[in-house]
Amino acid sequence: MLSDEMADTELKQALDEARTPHGTVDNVLRVHSLRPNTMKGHMALYKSCLHDDTNTLPEWLQETISSYVSILNSCEYSLLNHWKNAEFLIRDKEKSNKIYFSLKNRKPQDCFTGLELALMQYAEKLTLRPSDIKRADVDLSLIHI
């Protein structure tokens, strides 16, 4: 992986586009440093899912749902990246700690109600039991969004 100091103009541009809200470049993206076009493709997919202007969910909630999916998948690397972003976007240490522990304990109902809880439950079902997803699950999620 190439550092910022070793980057040529094309890579510097790709790295700048890949920076998190707190200014770092996650290793999952930096690994593309030898092929900046693959980094750009990775970022295009990521941003279209989580940080697109047409998304109606707040960014903190998108990152929190991503964190919960990371927990459900037992993926610590993904959790560290998504949770760092969620925590930054929540901007309330006490609230973010409470949310984090409720998700780690797989009890989102301890922090969420209504739409937010429905989305957490949908994400859990889609992650752990995708074959159990019914049309009503998808329709319900669309109503809330």
Give the role of each language-model region:
Residues 1-56, 94:
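Mobile cap/lid helix-loop segments that border enzyme active or cofactor-binding sites
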Residues 95-101, 139:
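Ferredoxin-type iron-sulfur electron-transfer modules in oxidoreductases and energy-metabolism complexes
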Residues 66-69, 114-133:
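Amphipathic, charged-and-aliphatic alpha-helical interface segments
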Residues 102-112:
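Acidic/His metal-coordination segments adjacent to aromatic residues that form catalytic metal sites
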Residues 25-34, 59-74:
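Alpha-helical scaffold segments that form or flank carboxylate-/histidine-based iron centers
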Residues 65-89, 100, 133:
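Short, thiol/selenol-centered motifs that function as redox-active sites or metal-ligating centers
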Residues 143-145:
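Conserved small/polar residues in nucleotide/adenosyl-binding loops
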